[in-house]
Amino acid sequence: GGAGLPRAEASFDVSEKNSVKEYILRRLLYSAMTLLAIATILFVMFRLMPGDPTAQVISPALDEVAQRRMREAFGLDQPMIVQFFLYLKNLVTLEWGRSFTTSEKVFDILVYRFWNTMLLMAVGLLLTFAIGISVGMVMGWRRGGKLDLGATVVSLVMQSAPPFITGILLLIVLSYRLDLFPTGGMSSPGNRPGDLLDFIVSADFLHHLVLPTITITAYYLATPMLIMRDSMLEVLGSDYVEFARAKGLPPGRVMIRHAARNALLAVVTIFSILLGFAIGGQVIVETVFSWPGMGLAMVEAAARHDYPVAQASFLMLAVIVIVMNLVVDISYCWLDPRIRLGS
């Protein structure tokens, strides 16, 4: 009878591994379908915008032959369905065309902007989650204390203020009146080292980074902090925490090693949701602080009817959200084994 157990366990391991592969493949398929849907919506939306985008590059003063050649160069003479499939092919091959206003390659414009956006967003979200998890852990451990009540009120007040209001107030008080921080941009004129690492650790860059980071952190801090607090309260009533206390372990070790470690799973689940909101907020923050990222590029391009840049910016922001959601889904699959064999 016992001889059959190893085969049964091996069979279970194989089925579990297959379920993980199926789950990952399913998520990859959903992500690809979502990206295709977004690309299609962007193609249609930018061609339904009011105004004539071709007026930016095709002057009415040109004769008909010159205008026709310009339309052919930009592929605007083709039927809409042909333009759509060319658009999809160009997306895959990274041939995103040229800007209608500057004639630069769209890919070259946005690669530079992409890293600027990722840098600001990464610093803002890392700070948000680091503070939120740490404070939320202590709030849950000391429920009903002054920190619990005070941090809850302050975080909810900060979250209720839109990021553009917070950003403008910070600029008025700390930049214009007190002259403590720059009013915008990533660096002072003529003060940008060639090496990326030297630049991001320079005092000038960090000085420009402070206000946008405070704006992002202030707006999104309440979510991870309050979820960590509530998750801690649930975990603190569990048997293994009570057992750790009964063993006489130090309170700090019980809080961090036994309670907080298990409470973190709830925070991981909301990361992808918060990321989606953060992408939308990034557009506002970059516009308020003149941060040269994709959000600002998208706003400027939409205002100029430069739809090659605008739709590529939208798409790149969507790709960031989709990829990060995929990473979180897969990591959650490993963190919570119930997902592997679940629906």
Residue ranges and their predicted role:
Residues G2-G4:
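Intrinsic, low-complexity polybasic segments
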Residues E16-M45:
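Charged, compositionally biased N-terminal leader segments and the immediate start
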Residues S19-Y23, L110, F114-L147, P163, ...:
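Alpha-helical transmembrane segments of integral membrane proteins
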Residues T34-F85, L174-V201:
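Hydrophobic alpha-helical transmembrane segments of membrane transport/permease proteins
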